[in-house]
């Protein structure tokens, strides 16, 4: 144990020295918008030319010179943040993303959205899922390969991740019970759901202002279910509630919270379908690809709702000097982010709080 800890410390020191010594010309791979080419991103040199390249790749425009200068300054800071993330998380690739002109506060407000519940599991109290047999689970598992996951969606500049996590779980549960995959309406939740956590009346579902997946389940049980995406399409902003009970496609029967145990999470995933989860998205702002296995990532600052769709058995972690199993996570920032819209995160030790807010839902077909 001492030798392993010493080896990890030496590795960290080497990585830190490398970053500090070469910050002016450190190269981080940047996947461009088409996800087919890779360009070098020279940190600290020719910052403005790199900023213009970023603007071109991601279709960014600024209305005034003042705004341009402001965003350029933020971009320069985020390039350095990407270098720091690369050092802390070398088994993944970090660099310039579509969020590189946003402050951390702007990023959290516009692109995350799980309500702050003070580090607790949060949300309406559902029954805790019964313990599930974990022996015999497959080494690797992916609901995408079985046809149980819809295409990656895009929440836009709206803190509605909680709605996408909720619909993803309902879509998966419906697929497990019927064999049919439907794309369900996030906009119904954004417009109509105002359910609150009974333990914290400030933690209410509030459209683009954030919410909780368990609150959303409670709303759906009371409202009668979810419409399909095609009948209630997403707009990226809150509007008047247009829910039509006659158009309900899937009804929510109940929901459960999954125990804080990674084997139980994996077993429930395999047996019951994709799971709604919350996590700390701090490393996701600069994430481009690979298995993210950060040395330090707070478990308490859970702020983003995503969908757990599978797991893999072998993702090499440089800092941890071994192969580590990982989760496969569907995000809601479009296909140009991450690995075609997906995130891989190390399993073990509740990294980034991934175990702390996991729930499953049971559905039935609308009659």
Swiss-Prot record:
Question: Which PROSITE patterns does the record match to this protein?
Answer: THIOL_PROTEASE_ASN, THIOL_PROTEASE_CYS, THIOL_PROTEASE_HIS
Does the keyword section mention Glycoprotein? yes
Disulphide bonds annotated for this chain are 158-208, 192-241, 297-352
User: Which residues are modified by glycosylation?
Assistant: 61, 254
- Record-annotated active site: 161, 304, 331
Domain of life of the source:
Eukaryota
Protein name listed in UniProt: Probable cysteine protease RD19D
């Amino acid at each position: 144990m001492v030798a392993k800890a010493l080896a990890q410390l030496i590795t960290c020191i080497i990585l830190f020295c490398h970053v500090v010594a070469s910050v002016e010309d450190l190269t981080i791979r940047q996947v461009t918008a088409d996800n087919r080419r890779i360009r070098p991103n020279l940190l600290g040199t020719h910052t403005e030319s790199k900023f213009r390249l970023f603007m071109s790749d991601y279709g960014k425009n600024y209305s005034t010179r003042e705004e341009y200068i402001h965003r350029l300054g933020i971009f320069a800071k985020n390039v350095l943040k990407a270098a720091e993330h690369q050092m802390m998380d070398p088994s993944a690739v970090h660099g310039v993303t579509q969020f590189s002109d946003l402050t951390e506060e702007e990023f959290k407000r516009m692109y995350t959205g799980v309500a702050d519940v003070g580090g607790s599991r949060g949300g309406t109290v559902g029954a805790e899922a019964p313990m599930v047999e974990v022996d015999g689970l497959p080494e690797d598992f992916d609901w995408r390969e079985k046809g149980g996951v819809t295409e990656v969606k895009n929440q836009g500049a709206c803190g509605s991740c909680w709605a996408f996590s909720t619909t993803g779980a309902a879509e998966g549960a419906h697929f497990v019970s019927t064999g049919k995959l439907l794309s369900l309406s996030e906009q119904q939740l954004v417009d109509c759901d105002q359910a609150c956590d009974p333990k914290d009346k400030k933690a209410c579902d509030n459209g683009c202002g954030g919410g909780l997946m368990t609150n959303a389940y409670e709303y759906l049980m009371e409202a009668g279910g979810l419409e399909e995406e095609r009948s209630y399409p997403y707009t990226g902003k809150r509007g008047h509630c247009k829910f039509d009970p006659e158009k309900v496609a899937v009804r929510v029967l109940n929901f459960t919270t999954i125990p804080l145990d990674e084997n139980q999470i994996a077993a429930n995933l395999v047996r019951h379908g994709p799971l709604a989860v919350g996590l700390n998205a701090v490393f996701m702002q600069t994430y481009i690809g690979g298995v993210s296995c950060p040395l330090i990532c707070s478990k308490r600052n859970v702020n983003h709702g995503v969908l757990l769709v599978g797991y893999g058995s072998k993702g090499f972690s440089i800092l941890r000097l071994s192969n580590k199993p990982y989760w496969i996570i569907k995000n809601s920032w479009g296909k140009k982010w991450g690995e075609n819209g997906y995130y891989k995160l190390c399993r073990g030790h509740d990294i980034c709080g991934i175990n702390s807010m996991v729930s499953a839902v049971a559905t039935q077909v609308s009659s």
